[in-house]
Curated annotation (Swiss-Prot):
InterPro entries cross-referenced by the UniProt entry: NifW
Cystine bridges: none
Protein name: Nitrogenase-stabilizing/protective protein NifW
Function: May protect the nitrogenase Fe-Mo protein from oxidative damage.
Domain of life, source organism: Bacteria
Assembly with partners or alone: Homotrimer; associates with NifD.
Keyword GTP-binding: no
HAMAP family reported in the protein's UniProt record: NifW
Organism for this UniProt entry: Rhodopseudomonas palustris (strain HaA2)
Stated family: Belongs to the NifW family.
GO biological process, alphabetically ordered: nitrogen fixation
Source lineage: Bacteria, Pseudomonadati, Pseudomonadota, Alphaproteobacteria, Hyphomicrobiales
Keyword field: Nitrogen fixation
């Protein structure tokens, strides 16, 4: 194996960590879209940026990027971001309910028993 091949193989083994590292250092949702070369409508991102990134994280949790070449790891991350973005193009953050506060807003509330204090307890 030549030094170039060894260097390339070593770079590929670090590739998933590299793209993930770049995404972790991104300072805005727009940077995610730019890093992964995903086209987006600024109006959608302005309304749902945190929701899109949270959903992307949920989708990425199901992906195994370990050991993938850089190009494939980047392509998978791109596909995941496109999928998360598409969720919010087709519907609203309220419809998707990514965050707990939105899930709890529509969760059925358990009926509470009426408060009862016996007269004996008042003595």
């Amino acid at each position: 194996m030549s030094a170039t091949q060894a260097s390339s193989q070593q770079a590929d083994s670090k590739a998933p960590a590299d793209i993930i590292g770049q995404l972790q250092r991104a300072a805005s949702a727009e940077e995610f879209f730019q890093l992964l070369d995903v086209a987006y409508d600024p109006n959608v991102v302005n309304v749902a940026r945190l929701h899109i990134l949270k959903r992307m994280g949920q989708y990425l949790a199901g992906e195994d990027l370990a050991g993938l070449p850089a190009a494939e790891a980047t392509a998978r991350c791109k596909a995941v971001l496109e999928r998360a973005y598409a969720d919010f193009v087709a519907s609203t953050p309220l419809d998707q309910r990514v965050f707990k506060v939105l899930k709890d807003a529509v969760a059925p509330k358990s009926p509470r028993a009426p408060a009862f204090v016996s007269l004996d307890a008042l003595k």
